[in-house]
Amino acid sequence: MKDRTQELRTAKDSDDDDDVTVTVDRDRFMDEFFEQVEEIRGFIDKIAENVEEVKRKHSAILASPNPDEKTKEELEELMSDIKKTANKVRSKLKSIEQSIEQEEGLNRSSADLRIRKTQHSTLSRKFVEVMSEYNATQSDYRERCKGRIQRQLEITGRTTTSEELEDMLESGNPAIFASGIIMDSSISKQALSEIETRHSEIIKLENSIRELHDMFMDMAMLVESQGEMIDRIEYNVEHAVDYVERAVSDTKKAVKYQSKARRKKIMIIICCVILGIIIASTIGGIFG
């Protein structure tokens, strides 16, 4: 009969090598994934920093009736940079999402997949939060520009309601603001100049909001759909922590009780020994 021991040993070694290869490939994949996570987090942090700088530029522009061109150019550069970086983040998050969906479609479930889903959800939420802050910043700036236009119109003697002013802004025609204004003083001319400046800022702002709207809604819907899953994970983690804390507490109590029992046992043994010595001495005295 042919000895197959060596053949079986060779086959086992080959299987072991395959397992090692799969493990190494998986570890390398997760290392690359975490590098990507850090890159995305860095992009989101960069957007957050730019949003704060945008707020400062808004305040500087509103503080001057005729802001200098350099400040306005710097604001446009910041807005452009935010848009480019946001598109990068969205693209990378989409790529991770598709990768996760492919594995779920194959009914694969692993610790690595759960980690990737959690990281993707966390990054998506953080991204939507920073973009929500940017959107709120833009909306606030629009309202402040609108308020300045309304005040300048009042200076020229023209009173408008908020709804009327909104209709004028939506028309996109700057000439509509000059209608009915008598240009007989430098005050009226200066007021109209600021009105045109603020109107121009609002138009740029609305274009920026429009460009980012679809992306923002897409990511917001994604995060909303993930909300229940994240809440469930957080619930499980919290209960796991409570369970561990109770287990540690119970263990400490058990150790404490065990220690007390051990001390009692030792004391009983010592008492028995002493009692034995006393009895032995007494008996010895009687018969001695």
Swiss-Prot record:
The modification Phosphoserine is found at S14, S64, S95, S188. SMART domains: SynN (SM00503), t_SNARE (SM00397). Belongs to the syntaxin family. Phosphorylated by CK2. Phosphorylation at Ser-188 by DAPK1 significantly decreases its interaction with STXBP1. (Microbial infection) Targeted and hydrolyzed by C.botulinum neurotoxin type C (BoNT/C), which hydrolyzes the 253-Lys-|-Ala-254 bond. Cleavage inhibits neurotransmitter release. This is Syntaxin-1A. Residues 1-13 have a biased composition (Basic and acidic residues). Plays an essential role in hormone and neurotransmitter calcium-dependent exocytosis and endocytosis. Part of the SNARE (Soluble NSF Attachment Receptor) complex composed of SNAP25, STX1A and VAMP2 which mediates the fusion of synaptic vesicles with the presynaptic plasma membrane. STX1A and SNAP25 are localized on the plasma membrane while VAMP2 resides in synaptic vesicles. The pairing of the three SNAREs from the N-terminal SNARE motifs to the C-terminal anchors leads to the formation of the SNARE complex, which brings membranes into close proximity and results in final fusion. GO terms for biological process: calcium-ion regulated exocytosis; exocytosis; hormone secretion; insulin secretion; intracellular protein transport; modulation of excitatory postsynaptic potential; neurotransmitter transport; positive regulation of calcium ion-dependent exocytosis. Residues 1-20 are annotated as: Disordered. Part of the SNARE core complex containing SNAP25, VAMP2 and STX1A; this complex constitutes the basic catalytic machinery of the complex neurotransmitter release apparatus. The SNARE complex interacts with CPLX1. Interacts with STXBP1. The interaction with STXBP1 promotes assembly of the SNARE complex. Interacts (via C-terminus) with KCNB1 (via C-terminus); the interaction increases in a calcium-dependent manner and induces a pore-independent enhancement of exocytosis in neuroendocrine cells, chromaffin cells, pancreatic beta cells and from the soma of dorsal root ganglia (DRG) neurons. One of its GO terms (cellular component) is actomyosin. The keyword Nucleotidyltransferase does not apply. Its main location: membrane. The record marks K253, A254 as: (Microbial infection) Cleavage. Residues 68-109 form a coiled coil. One of its GO terms (molecular function) is SNAP receptor activity. Residues 192-254 form the t-SNARE coiled-coil homology domain. Keywords: Cell membrane, Coiled coil, Cytoplasmic vesicle, Exocytosis, Isopeptide bond, Membrane, Neurotransmitter transport, Phosphoprotein, Synapse, Synaptosome, Transmembrane, Transmembrane helix, Transport, Ubl conjugation. It is found in: Cytoplasmic vesicle, Secretory vesicle, Synaptic vesicle membrane; Cell membrane; Synapse, Synaptosome. Gene3D superfamilies: 1.20.5.110, 1.20.58.70.
